[in-house]
């Protein structure tokens, strides 16, 4: 698909720019870490990707193996969906989605409609067809508001760590690794994004210090310790007392 070619070229271009800043003297650590984390950033989870993952034949085969399902016996799989208004609006074309989310009233109204936990039996024909149709929107994905948001966020993150490469190489590497904090879908993604933003705010606070990279590593590890990020907040509080 044209969208896949576009994504591959975009990935290569972004990585080439980083490799040009890197060197053998540093064992290309920044480039290696960037290759992994930029790829993960481009494979963000939205409704289209979640639908794609849930309708793959390999997934059903894996579940059958894990459950020890006897051949010709059909296993029934129930999925839990909990989309927020943001996930739905994220599927809109960029211009329409941007217009829609500017109104808090529209967003609240939509959230009341969609933000309800739903259990869907994905092995039933109607549910499977719905998910399959959604998964087929992969080529449309690059036109959505969510794609534009993810693209801009990724660019900001890349520009952030690239700025530290000449003088604080190790800090740049640690900022690259912070991308692992962002994962999942819906509420899980929101929590991860919040931890990522707080960790990078801490990186900015310590950026002039010789031990800046160590501090960012500590912040990242603290962010992974609990769901809400309380350990991270504690580490940030410590930083503010020493700068």
Model regions and ranges:
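Short, small-residue-biased leader/transition segments that mark boundaries at the very start
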Residues: 2-6
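Structural motif
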Residues: 20-34, 169-173
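Short amphipathic alpha-helical segments and their helix-coil junctions
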Residues: 7-26, 154-163
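Soluble, non-transmembrane catalytic domains of enzymes that act on hydrophobic metabolites at membranes
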Residues: 44-46
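Short, surface-exposed acidic
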Residues: 26-31, 50, 211-212
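C-terminal amphipathic alpha-helical interaction region
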Residues: 51-243
């Amino acid at each position: 698909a044209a969208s896949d070619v576009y994504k591959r070229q975009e990935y290569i271009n972004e990585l080439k720019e980083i490799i040009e800043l890197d060197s053998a003297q540093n064992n290309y650590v920044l480039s290696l870490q960037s290759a992994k984390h930029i790829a993960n950033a481009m494979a963000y989870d939205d409704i289209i990707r979640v639908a794609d993952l849930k309708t793959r034949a390999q997934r059903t085969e894996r579940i059958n193996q894990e459950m020890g399902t006897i051949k010709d016996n059909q296993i029934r799989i129930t999925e839990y969906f909990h989309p927020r208004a943001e996930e739905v609006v994220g599927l809109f074309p960029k211009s329409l989605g941007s217009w829609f989310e500017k109104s808090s009233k529209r967003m609240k109204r939509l959230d009341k409609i969609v933000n309800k936990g739903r259990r869907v039996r994905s092995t039933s024909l109607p549910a499977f067809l719905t998910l399959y149709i959604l998964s087929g929107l992969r080529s449309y994905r690059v036109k959505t508001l969510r794609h534009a948001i993810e693209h801009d966020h990724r660019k900001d993150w890349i520009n952030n760590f690239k700025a530290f490469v000449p003088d604080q190489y190790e800090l740049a590497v640690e900022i690259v690794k912070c991308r692992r904090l962002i994962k999942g879908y819906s509420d899980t993604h929101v929590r991860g994004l919040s931890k990522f933003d707080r960790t990078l705010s801490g990186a900015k606070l310590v950026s002039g210090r010789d031990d800046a990279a160590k501090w960012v590593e500590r912040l990242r590890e603290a962010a992974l310790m609990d769901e809400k990020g309380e350990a991270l907040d504690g580490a940030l509080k410590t930083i503010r007392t020493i700068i």
